[in-house]
Amino acid sequence: AMLGQGRTAGVFQLESAGITGVCVGMQPQSIEDLTAIVALYRPGPMDSIPKFIDSKLHPEKITYKTPQLQSILDVTYGCIVYQEQVIEIFRKLGGYTLGQADNMRRAISKKKQQVIVAERKAFVYGDPDRGIPGAIANGVDEQAANVIYDEILDFANYAFNKAHAVCYAKVSYDTAYLKCHYPKQYMAALMTSVQDNSMKVAGYIAACREMGLQLLLPDINHSESAFTVEPEGIRFGLAAVKNVGKGLVEQIVAERQADGPFASFRQLCERLSQTDLNKRAMENLIRCGAMDCFGHKRAQLLLVYDQAMTDAAQNRRRNLEGQIDLFSMDQTENETEIPMPDVPELPPQERMVGEKETTGLYLSGHPMDAYRPMLKNAHVASIGDIMTSFAEGADRYRDEQVVTVAGVIQSIRTRPTRNGSLMAYIVLEDDGTKTAYRLEFERGKTNGKQYS
């Protein structure tokens, strides 16, 4: 049901937009169905997918050109899909030995057209010199035998080995099973595997939200290096935060395991003063939300972290030099937190930009959230779907087709052209997918308005 509903994100071999559509159409129910999808969704056999789906959904429409084909093609609803089926056709209809039939399989897989075309006579009429009786001698009508061989010739252009397809389909099935029955664990592992690619992570985060899984912000007291599973959802991994390397994350986790979670921002600065934590990493941890657990505004922490880290480093040096007496140590321990300035919190837009710049993702929200009802009514196309359609040669989107897209402008660059007009290159991003647009317009004839 999951695959048939198009929820294929993260499923091996099945997550592209085009093959997701095939899954929705075919409604796969077994490994055999997945094997056929993997074998058919390629440039050659893709044209036969509609016939395959129609035959699967309407088995009463399936016809065989000779009864002998039913036992060979029933598993693929009357369609030739695999090289192994061709072997059986040569054996059962043409009377070939297994070795002779396998030789034809090799010729087909290597696309030896001359050999394949020359073999028609032997398949239909037989070849006594090689002990091949032929299809007619085995009770197949001459016209039907020639039509079957024509289909074999067509098949030679996209022949696929079933053993290979089954191997792919088995992994597809396993990953689909894990996603269906262990969604949090699977999606956490999946995002960890691509955490260096923010665009892929963004796509999987969108899939998590569609699945009803909550993405928990990075947390200095809970996050580990990888994405991890918690009762409330999936916790963002600290290693995905820019300028926070895995070595530093390991030091943070080791400190938590040794002495418990950090009770305050001051304590964090003190306890991590001898690690690889530098000011750039600290700033990024604050901006991505990893310090929200201390109950302070991000705007406040951004104003005090520099001095707090400097003070912590000085205290550590004095402690090593024996310059801190017992009274001052006790006083430091009794101070629960650094005094915070009375400033307003960052505006939502600035907060989301901070998350984007430090993780490559919008975490606590998306700038487009307020516009989604309007975008849905406007039938806005997904940039990711458009790019996938062109990459796979599908016809859902085509050159010169007019589509409506919406997103956040990530960058804009202008330059004059040779004819004196102005050209702009704009990088637009919707939910995690970026694309570049080139706009050209005449000087003095632009009517631009800024929207916020």
Regions found by a protein language model. Name each.
Residues A1-S452:
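Noncatalytic, beta-rich nucleic-acid-contacting surfaces in large DNA/RNA-processing enzymes
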